[in-house]
Amino acid sequence: MKLNFLHLLNQLKSVCNKFDGESNDAKIIFLETLSTKPVPFNKNTSEYLNVLLFLCAHSGNAETLILAESELKRISLALKKASRKEKTQLVNSGLPFTPSLSTYTHELLQWMITYPKINIGIDSFYKSEVDLSTSLTLTLPSLEKEYTGMSYNNKGLLQILQVPKESQLSFILSEFSKLNDQPFVKDYFFNALQLYVKLIPKDEAFSKAYNRMPLQGHFFHTEIIKQFDQLALLNKKLPLPKKLSAHQFKDVQTVIKNSLALLQRETDPVTYMDERSFKLYELERGISIAIYGMKAERQLPLESYVGYTLFKNGYPAAYGGCWVFGKRALFGINIFEPYRGGESGFMMCQLLRVYRQAFGVDYFEVEPYQYGQGNPEGISSGAYWFYYRFGFRSLEPVLNKLAESEFEKIKQIKGFRSTEDTLLRFTESNVALQLGKRVPLTVAEVRDKVTAYVSEKHAGNRVQAEKIVVKNTLEKIEKIKLLTKQQKKVLSETAFMCEVLHIHSASKIKAVHQMVLTKSEDLYAYQQHLLAALK
C-alpha cells in the first residue's frame, strides 16, 4: 500500500523520541520515504517542521541528522518557489520564506527595521485604543501639531504630513523615539495604537528551521534521560561562561530575539536586554543556557527580572525567566513546541542549577498558570506532577496533603490519572522547591510593610515618607558621590527597605550603598550586595 505524507509523518512522530536500534532504523526509513513526497503547503508542513527540529536537536546518529537537515533544506527550497498565495496560507507558521503578521513593542521594531534578513512594513492599525493624532501630539514639532487636531484618521494624518508609504513605519518609530526618556508613557501610547506589521523574510535565516546558534560539536542521543540525581545536578559546579566575540554575541542575540518574534511573542528581558549582563553557559547533553537582565530604565524595584534562553544542540528550545530577590526566585519555563517530549525535566533542572549558582537562589516558586490555571493544556498534560516529581510542593498544606495521597495512587495503581477537578484544585496555590532551611522574604512582603509604614508613620504622605527614609539612609552612608537618575530611584527603594526591615548595621548599610551604585550597572554585583543586606 502506498503511504501518504500524513501517514508517514505520524509514523515518524511515533518513533522520534525513541533510540533503540529498531526505532533509529525506522527514523531513517521514514525520512527517506518522506523525502520523495511533494511538500504540502498546509498545516502538515508545520507539523513536519516540528518533528524535523526535534530530530535535529535530539538526533541519535549522524545519518538521521543529515537526513533531517536535508529535509529542512528541501522544505525551504519548495517554499522559496511557492506562490504568494501559498506562502500567505502559512502566515505565522515560522516556516522559511513565509510571512509573519503581529504587533511588537517600539523597542523590538526599532531593532527589526535594522535586521537585514527581512522586509517589514505596516499592515494595519487594528482596533486602536488611541489614534495616531493623539499620540503624535506629544512628539511633532510645534508648527505641525495643529494637524493633530483636524480629525484626520491615521492614514489621512500620514498623508497630510507627506510621509511616503515606504517610510511610514520608520517615521512612526522615529517620532516615538522622542519619548525614550519617558519609557512607560511611550509604551502606553505605542501599544494602544495596535500597530500590526508584516514581516517578509528575504532568506531562510528568519525561520524556525534556520534560527539556530552555531555549534562546534553535536551531542548525539542514545536515550531520553528521565531519571537522574536532581540534587547532584543542582549542586554541580557551573563552568565559566563562554567567551564570545562581538560578532558571536550579535549572532546569539539575533537568534534569541527571532525565536520569540517568530512566535509573535516578546519578553521584557529579551526586548530590553542589558547586553552587559549576558552570560552563556555550555552544559551537558547539548544544552547551552543564556541568561540576561534588563536595561536600567526597565528594571523592577528591588528584584531582578532575569530572562533566559535554553538551547539544545544550538536550537532555541525553551525560554522564560526568574524574578530574583535575594535567595528567592519566581520561576517560569516555556518549552518551544517542537522540543516537547524530550528531556524537559533535565532541561528545567539545568535552568535551576544556573540560577541557583549564578544568583545564590535556594527557593524557587512557580505560579499556577504553569500547571493549569487558565491553561487547559497544563491540566490535560498533568503538568502539576511534572513539578511534583522534581520536589516542588503546594504552599497550601491542604493541597499538599491531597497531592501526597494522589501521588501514592499514581505509584500504586497502574494507569491511574488524577481527575480534572483535582488538578484544578492544585492551581489554587503556588508550588515551591525549597533547598535551604528557611523560606526567604518576598518583595510583596516588603511592599506591604512599606505601605503600612507610610500609613502609620506619615498619614499616607508618600512624599514626606520618601524624604525622611532617604535622609535617614544617607546619614548612615559615610560618603556618597553624585547619583544618577537611576541610582536615585534605587536609593529610594532601598531606603524604604532599610526602614521597614530595620537594616541599621554598618556592614549592611555598606551593602545597601553598593546596591544603589550597582543595580543599573552590574546585575550580578547587585544581587550579591542584596544577599548581604538581607543576611
Predicted feature residues:
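A conserved beta-strand-loop-helix scaffold within acyl/acetyltransferase catalytic domains
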Residues: 241-340, 349, 353-359, 492-503, ...
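Long, charge-dense tracts
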Residues: 111-255
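Long, compositionally biased intrinsically disordered regions
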Residues: 1-143, 412-535
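Long, charge-rich alpha-helical interaction segments
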Residues: 393, 401-422
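Sequence-level detector for tyrosine residue identity
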Residues: 48, 104, 115, 126, ...
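Acyl-donor binding region in acyl/amide transferases
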Residues: 137, 146, 155-158, 168-179, ...
